[in-house]
């Protein structure tokens, strides 16, 4: 069982205290339903060697280290491989380099400098395996809760957390819809790589706003296209082989949507074209990746002939 009592204690006296009281039962109910591969992934977690990190770096990346021998490293590598595919990272865990599909550290280096997370209560919606949660703590966040219903990501988070049990980061295998309305308890809310999967983009923005305290900040990172405030791409079918991509607005259109949803002080802090160096297949993620989804003769287009992935990060205030 995963014990959430430290989280409940952490949230005592905050606007999230009443919500926290029901989290253990909510988590236990989710775990009871489970997933067909959960036992296998738990086996991988149990196979991780018992180590105590003497070096912890969450500022320059995600690196844990201590004195350990080659046999222990081999055990670590085999156990972590049992949790493949690894999407977000990279992680350096006691001499084992988990070379993930995404160079998420590149994204963080673009986004992080624009944020003030010092002492903030943070929610990361669609947090994946929690890579960014650890980086948020490295940037001074007081605590970080991530929500993502993907069970493999949940187990990957547990793999890192078991070496950092005292740090105030929690991963809940919930969807945003599992959170109560009008939560209004987080200083900063992240939605990175989620927005374009939502069929109702304005509803998503309103739900994110509901999670923020008054004056809190939204960090929204999503796929965009070039164009003016009236330009929005709605793929006819797939986008970069993904069926679940609905809306790719231009940056000015997205800024307008944020204002329409009631946000203020909207500003774009980064726009980057995703390269095949930033997202690619590795030993830790052996499936198809970005290069397979782009036109082989013209990387400015997807295989469907649509504009290649371009990502923007916008900040907005409640």
From Swiss-Prot:
Enzyme class: transferase
Any one GO molecular-function label of the UniProt entry: methyltransferase activity
Protein residues bound to carboxy-S-adenosyl-L-methionine: 88, 102, 107, 126, 176-177, 192, 196, 311
Pfam families: Methyltransf_9
NCBIfam families linked: PRK15068.1 (NF011650), tRNA 5-methoxyuridine(34)/uridine 5-oxyacetic acid(34) synthase CmoB (TIGR00452)
Family: Belongs to the class I-like SAM-binding methyltransferase superfamily. CmoB family.
Primary role: Catalyzes carboxymethyl transfer from carboxy-S-adenosyl-L-methionine (Cx-SAM) to 5-hydroxyuridine (ho5U) to form 5-carboxymethoxyuridine (cmo5U) at position 34 in tRNAs.
Subunit structure: Homotetramer.
Record protein name field: tRNA U34 carboxymethyltransferase
